Amino acid sequence: MKIVEGNLSVDKSKKVAIINARFNHFITDRLVEGAKDAYARHGGNPEELDLILVPGAFEIPFALDKALASGKYDAVCCLGAVIRGATPHFDYVSAEATKGVANVTLKYGKPATFGVLTVDSIEQAIERAGTKAGNKGAEAMAGLIELINLYGSLEK
């Protein structure tokens, strides 16, 4: 059986962007740093990444659609943090951001990863932004690098 999978080596011929939600920036800024670090650890130059800032996680799919439609980007790492509060707002934002990113990815046939934290507390967000539970921004970028290479293998 032939196994087809991506690897964790940056394809320097591909243009990559990060879309980051500014809401909860004390968390999302750490996710961006993790993503940049992962890109560097796997052979890329973080200075070659474009950072697209949006107000919140709900706006990520719109920016992703515009970025991929432009033809400028081969892949996008989407980052943000939605923290549960006392109202159902969390449920609406997290669900629509998730569905939106998935739909846009399928629409353009280009890889995007979903590094948007959906957590119950600030403590959980902090843990996932570089303390106890690693950095989910770094994980999202590593996944994106692997997907870029997998897509390349599947297109041949």
Swiss-Prot record:
Q: What is this protein called?
A: 6,7-dimethyl-8-ribityllumazine synthase
| Record GO cellular component, one term | riboflavin synthase complex
Please give a single GO biological process term from the UniProt record: riboflavin biosynthetic process
- Listed as disulfide-bonded, the cysteine pairs are none
In alphabetical order, the GO MF annotations are: 6,7-dimethyl-8-ribityllumazine synthase activity
Pathway listed for it is: Cofactor biosynthesis; riboflavin biosynthesis; riboflavin from 2-hydroxy-3-oxobutyl phosphate and 5-amino-6-(D-ribitylamino)uracil: step 1/2
What sections of the sequence does the record tag as coiled-coil? none
Where, by residue number, does 5-amino-6-(D-ribitylamino)uracil bind? Answer: F23, A57, F58, E59, A81, V82, I83, F114
* Entry superkingdom: Bacteria
Which sites bind (2S)-2-hydroxy-3-oxobutyl phosphate?
A: A86, T87, R128
Residues annotated as the enzyme's active site? H89 (proton donor)
* Organism encoding this protein: Sulfurovum sp. (strain NBC37-1)
UniProtKB keywords: Riboflavin biosynthesis, Transferase
Q: Which Pfam families match?
A: DMRL_synthase (PF00885)
According to UniProt, the reaction catalysed is:
(2S)-2-hydroxy-3-oxobutyl phosphate + 5-amino-6-(D-ribitylamino)uracil = 6,7-dimethyl-8-(1-D-ribityl)lumazine + phosphate + 2 H2O + H(+)
Please describe what this protein does: Catalyzes the formation of 6,7-dimethyl-8-ribityllumazine by condensation of 5-amino-6-(D-ribitylamino)uracil with 3,4-dihydroxy-2-butanone 4-phosphate. This is the penultimate step in the biosynthesis of riboflavin.
Q: What is its EC number?
A: 2.5.1.78
Q: Which family does it belong to?
A: Belongs to the DMRL synthase family.
